[in-house]
Amino acid sequence: MRQSAGTLLYRGDLEHLEVLLVHPSGAYNRRAPWSIPKGEPGDETDLEETARRETLEETGVAAGPLISLGDIVYKKSRKRVHCYAGPAPLDMEPKCASWEVDQARFVPLAEARTLLHPDQCAFLDRLVEHLQNL
């Protein structure tokens, strides 16, 4: 089974929570859902390192401390996606740092639920649950 790893970086408190999402580039993806910044493992075997690398490559944001939100399996493609969450660095604004994405921005949680790939919405729920338990 193919797999990828990415991050769900956030800022704000539970009432004003925003998460960092990216939109894939290209005419074929014009109406595609948004995603967490993610990618497939390269030479590294550590999935958290893959998530960090892909986030930096796609958004220009270097992730700080991360916790695992587990994984999901896409219903159609059966691809496994591992997600790591952490607070976004306060002084960093995302940018499209890769040809793979045409937008990278923080979006409010409610909006993220409408933009995000439906299978990835479970990561939003897991993030909220984690933050409620802090």
Which stretches of residues belong to each language-model region?
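Short, charged/polar surface micro-motifs in flexible loops or helix N-caps
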Residues: 13-16, 27-29, 42-43, 77, ...
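N-terminal strand-loop-strand
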Residues: 1-36
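Residue-level detector of conserved, well-ordered beta-strand and adjacent loop positions
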Residues: 22-23, 37, 70, 85
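Charged phosphate-binding loop/patch that engages nucleotide di/tri-phosphates or the phosphate backbone
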Residues: 116-134
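The catalytic Nudix box helix
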Residues: 36-69
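Structured beta->alpha junctions
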Residues: 26, 40, 72-73, 116
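Active-site-adjacent beta-strand/loop module that shapes the phosphate/pyrophosphate-binding cleft
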Residues: 2, 72-98, 103-105, 127
